[in-house]
Amino acid sequence: MRSEKRNFRSRLLAVGVALSVLLVACGDDSEPSGGDTGGGGTAEPATLRVALDWFPNPDHVALYYAQDNGFFDDQNLTVEFVTPSDVTAGLKLVATNRFDLSIFYQGDMFFAAQEDLPVIAVGSLVPQPLNSLMALHDSKVQGPDTVKGATIGVAGLPFDDAILDTIRKSQGLAEDDVESVNVGFDLVPALLSGQVDAAIGTYFNIEGIHIESETGEEPVIVKMEELGVPTYDELIVVANSEKLESDDAYADAVSRFLVAMVEATKAAQGDEAGSIENMKANTEYTDEEIEAMVPDTLPLLTSLQGLETGCFSLEAWQTFGEWMTSNNLLDEEVDPATIATNDYLPGC
């Protein structure tokens, strides 16, 4: 039962531009390099292997900005980003020490707690939701108040049903008032072909831009907070909780990684042109798409709750967990302090 709940978002890009990116899978099962570390510029060198949630894309702009502009070098870190052959396995790859860190999804941390995986979120990469209800500009669906009688494309993830139920409740609709169709990873093609009236699971800063480039019109985008879904951190940095406790060198390297990520995030936000050029070199999107996606993404790296860059609000995690429980995604409530911490990022 847990296996079907594990993946909060398997990154629903079935468009050709994403699939053209070469999958980097060599060495998935090798041990992380580790290494003794100290702190900052005088620290012993360390290497960290980081499993990405999906192919490199503008959601990772801060990571690649750090990589290409010396922020990891300043922390005496060598960082390798890898798209694993199974992008849904990020937490298990860290739990089994096959990767040092993973970029993954907040919702999955609650599932990991119920599976007793030794993982913990240590920093926020994208501190606000990117998921959305999306429709073409001329769709019958123009917002949550127009979903009655509509066909909504979903990927078959448990969160899809929870989001749909939240929409139905907010509009006083019965289950059969809105039809959902499982289109797997083909959300964008399903929208473009007219197979569905709208879709859940599309990132407005990525798929929204791609749809606009295909149709010449801005799609209808309804963000999660407008649908009644509590705010959450879309992408987080995940470490091995047991290793953090037992290996001081690993814990120090993780902290230095987070410091570099935060510094690079702030620098990237102040260098839109440089960030655009940086992502052009690291993704397979068209230059035109990157020139639109990156400016849309950079502001999303700022917390909606006024938190310092990279930091978590455990209160917000608690609220999101309660929403998951109320939508039958969890068997019991999970204490957010057991799955997320600010202890490894100075300034939180």
Residue ranges: model-predicted function:
Residues 2-13:
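Bacterial N-terminal signal peptides that target proteins for export
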Residues 13, 17-19:
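Hydrophobic helical h-region of N-terminal Sec-dependent signal peptides
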Residues 22-25:
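C-terminal motif of bacterial Sec signal peptides marking the signal peptidase cleavage site
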Residues 27-30:
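Bacterial signal peptide processing site
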Residues 36, 40-184, 188-193, 197-205, ...:
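Short, glycine-/small- and polar/acidic-enriched structural segments
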Residues 107-108, 186-189, 195-283:
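Pocket-lining segment of extracytoplasmic ligand-binding domains
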Residues 247-327:
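Secondary-structure end/capping motifs
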Residues 317-348:
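Conserved C-terminal helix/tail region of periplasmic/extracytoplasmic solute-binding proteins
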